[in-house]
Amino acid sequence: MRLNTISSAPGAKQAEKRVGRGIGSGWGKTCGRGHKGQKSRSGGFHKVGFEGGQMPLQRRVPKFGFSSRKARFRVEVRLDQLTKVNTDTVDIAALVKARLIPKWAKRVKVIASGKLDKPVSLQGIMVSAGARRAIEAAGGRIGE
């Protein structure tokens, strides 16, 4: 095989459709665009979302809410997951090491879900009201 002998597979390339070359071609005069109107003109097509001057959908629909930038780095941990951490004090680094939270997590909150059967000491982790009661009832403590 040589570079000068390489060719496309048969039927892989279609001939370009030449328009505006007489009635007999089937694509003469109007070239398949029909008569008059915006879509028959050169460069005549609306932008995406244009509804003919009517207020477009993306502007009619009400806007609400926002995405908190802090929430992107916040992760929730259940009470029963804290038993999987084998250190004296549970902090963000210990939770990452135990593979309970991803490395990108900056803020962690413990929520009251599941049972806590051993006392744990939390450091630098937010706690819900129900989780705080459960941790203190199990003999644990929460440091800020």
From Swiss-Prot:
GO MF annotations in UniProt: rRNA binding; structural constituent of ribosome
Keywords: Ribonucleoprotein, Ribosomal protein, RNA-binding, rRNA-binding
Keyword Ribonucleoprotein assigned: yes
Positions of region (Disordered): 1-52
UniProt-listed Pfam families: Ribosomal_L27A (PF00828)
A GO cellular-component term linked to this record: cytosolic large ribosomal subunit
InterPro entries registered for this protein in UniProt: Ribosomal_uL15, Ribosomal_uL15/eL18, Ribosomal_uL15/eL18_sf, Ribosomal_uL15_bac-type, Ribosomal_uL15_CS
Comp. bias intervals (Gly residues): 21-31
One GO biological process term: translation
PANTHER family on file: 50S RIBOSOMAL PROTEIN L15, LARGE RIBOSOMAL SUBUNIT PROTEIN UL15M
NCBIfam families per the UniProt record, alphabetical: rplO_bact
Family as reported in the entry's similarity comment: Belongs to the universal ribosomal protein uL15 family.
HAMAP family membership: Ribosomal_uL15 (MF_01341)
Primary role: Binds to the 23S rRNA.
Subunit structure: Part of the 50S ribosomal subunit.
Protein name listed in UniProt: Large ribosomal subunit protein uL15
Protein's gene: rplO
